[in-house]
């Protein structure tokens, strides 16, 4: 399956917030282990896809073969896409909650998990929107397997952390986000990070086009607030 991932979603661009243990576990696995399994969960927009993209990017830069399977887009492919993935250095399965109750997909993931265990040479990262035991899977053995490894909740960011995350993204794109503007965005917009990042990108383009710095009046005019 072809792999197209955002080139700006790396560990360097991820604001950790209250998630140092998860970040440390991921980086230890990627940098020092040849195998292992980590499951982490959060609500939608909590940053789990970003971390999977970051993991793929880190190993790809080292020349390792990786696989990323976004199950929210499973209609684009079939369960057989998982065949042979145990030969990769890293397999990332995103949004596993999307296949709960889908027996062919559940069986395909269960079989892949077992093949990865047997190979002993593949790292496996799986994300969901809830803990493994709450996924309402039809296959009890898969639920049991998912509960075996390291399990983390990806903690949501506080408002202060969201401001820091926005300012980090701005710096990585080559501009500054003043604190008052950032707090204005948090006050007036949906606080889900995906929405905030898309809005920040929109403001970046608008400020370049208008050759103006980001100020609250400029943001109000641009966003119609």
Swiss-Prot record:
Any GO BP: negative regulation of DNA-templated DNA replication initiation
Keyword presence, DNA repair: no
Keywords from the named record: DNA replication, DNA replication inhibitor
InterPro entries reported for this sequence: Chromosome_initiator_DnaA-like, DnaA_dom, Hda, Hda_Enterobact, Hda_lid, P-loop_NTPase
Regions annotated as coiled coil: none
Family classification: Belongs to the DnaA family. HdA subfamily.
Assembly with partners or alone: The active form seems to be an ADP-bound monomer. Forms the RIDA complex (regulatory inactivation of DnaA) of ATP-DnaA, ADP-Hda and the DNA-loaded beta sliding clamp (dnaN).
Biological function: Mediates the interaction of DNA replication initiator protein DnaA with DNA polymerase subunit beta sliding clamp (dnaN). Stimulates hydrolysis of ATP-DnaA to ADP-DnaA, rendering DnaA inactive for reinitiation, a process called regulatory inhibition of DnaA or RIDA.
Protein name: DnaA regulatory inactivator Hda
Species this protein is from: Cronobacter sakazakii (strain ATCC BAA-894) (Enterobacter sakazakii)
